[in-house]
A protein has these predicted regions:
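Short helix-coil boundary/hinge micro-motifs
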Residues: 1-270
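BZIP DNA-binding basic region
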Residues: 245-306
Length: 306
């Protein structure tokens, strides 16, 4: 996959500090800290590492790890790469500000097929509202008093308004939604791995259930254009980090040279050097063999005691 994205670029915004805050209704959100500083970066430079970290956050939940460990891992991820951009990922178009309402396909988080724009925005600005005016299909918003936010807005002036709005400090994403997305990605990976590992042990009905589960995984392909830099470069127009991760994860999932694997010992997701790679490190391999050997010896001791 590295070769695929070697001459590719994109951009996203991350802040250097995030926090989990509780809203008036008791719902928890992830949002940049008040004095956090934004940074524009190219997520494609860290594509494999980002996908692996996202999957391993999800695996913590799949393995029922303590909630404080999960929270720490989620905050670490968003500090590394930014929030997922759920506000622009969920609607039928990231340019939803150009329409009278927000239209939503089926998703895990919002049951309504359409929402008033103000009501939809309120889901992502529970603490501080933006200076926004919306009348029909016309909308405008202004940023003043914070030079950093003004500069950030001007940098993304040609992007969909909602995407630029999601880079502001006031933007927040529901913690449970973010956590669920990580868990969904981990579930997709384990479905794929179990399907092939257990293929000869399961019946055709069970195989079909696995296939149906995988068929539900997908997304709208991002648009792209070519930029003439030091050499021709593909520029991917990700309107949400979620969409970017989804695409990168998809390519890794079908990569036969360096397949995504689950460590047989620690259950960590890693890129295998070959198709039958079973351990993420020599240490895990050694520990697994030691525990396996102890288990055999314990069984033999029990037989001798009889």
């Amino acid at each position: 996959m590295n070769n695929l994205f070697a001459q590719s670029r994109s951009h996203w915004v991350r802040y250097d500090r995030y926090e989990i805050k509780t809203g008036k209704t008791g719902k928890r959100y992830i949002t940049p800290e008040k004095t956090a500083k934004p940074d524009i970066y190219n997520p494609l430079k860290e594509s494999s590492e980002m996908v692996l970290e996202a999957l391993n956050v999800g695996m913590l939940m799949m393995n029922r790890s303590p909630e404080d460990a999960v929270e720490k891992a989620i905050l670490t991820f968003v500090t590394h790469y930014g929030l997922l951009g759920l506000m622009t990922a969920l609607p039928t178009t990231p340019s939803f500000m150009d329409y009278e309402k927000v239209y939503l396909p089926k998703n895990h988080f919002i049951r309504a097929e359409s929402m008033e724009t103000e009501d939809y925005l309120a889901l992502f600005y529970p603490f501080d509202q933006l200076d926004l005016v919306k009348k029909g299909i016309e909308s405008s918003w202004s940023v003043s008093g914070d030079r950093t936010m003004v500069a950030l807005t001007m940098t993304f002036a040609d992007e969909p308004m909602a995407k630029t709005m999601s880079f502001q400090r006031e933007y927040a994403e529901p913690y449970e939604w973010v956590a669920q997305q990580f868990k969904d990605w981990a579930f997709t990976l384990t479905t794929s791995i179990l399907y092939y590992n257990d293929y000869n042990l399961i019946d055709e009905d069970t195989r079909n259930l696995y296939r149906m589960g995988m068929a539900a995984f997908g997304g709208i392909a991002p648009s792209y254009h070519i930029e003439l830099l030091d050499k021709p470069t593909i520029y991917w127009d990700f309107h949400s980090l979620l969409l970017g991760i989804q695409m990168m994860f998809s390519f890794l999932l079908v990569d036969g040279e360096k397949p995504l694997r689950l460590c047989k010992h620690c259950q960590k997701v890693f890129l295998g050097s070959r198709a039958n790679s079973a351990f993420c490190s020599p240490r895990c391999k050694n520990q697994y063999n030691v525990y396996k050997s102890r288990g055999k010896n314990k069984g033999q001791d029990g037989e001798n005691d009889d």
